[in-house]
Amino acid sequence: MSTSLFTAEEKRQVRWFVMRAYKNEKMAEDRLKDKEYGLEYFIPKHYAVRTYHGVKSKKLVPVIPSLLFVHASHSQITEFKKRYNFLQFAMWEKSTGAEYITVPDDQMDSFIKIASHYEEDTVYYRPEEIDLKRGMRVCIHGGKFDNVKGMFVRVQGKRNRRVVVLLEGVMAVSAEVHPCLLYTSPSPRDMR
């Protein structure tokens, strides 16, 4: 899920990095879209009621302020940061030292498929709020979440069991899926 020191070859490897843009999500989004860099990114968002000048309206806002994911090599991001230094790598403090937080491509693909629908029944969780031990590994076949891999678990506060995609140490997202679209995954490797 993460690496501490990169070799020259690893610096060129494209992966999903967890990044922070403190109070600059919109600027980060605009700069990452820029044709010069054109880095792939994802900011988990949801609709929330906000009041501006006494008027309530539903706005699409980041789920976790300042959190974004960038799909690029370490070298590409470092080059981007030379010009726009507001983007920071999210790090874990481990016994071996600080490590960059990265997410495997297949986990991120499943996460994006659920999170990008912006539906009201899509729910986000902190990792410690979800107990995946009682869940069953599943893959969704058909529907709008086709090929999403996650855990089918009962989530507190929800009537039906839901498919949960966990990004270890970062966040989780869940969606309600009809059980007829699910099949059990045979191997834990499918979830990595």
Predicted regions and their residues:
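Short coil/loop residues immediately preceding or within conserved phosphate-binding loops
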Residues: 135, 147
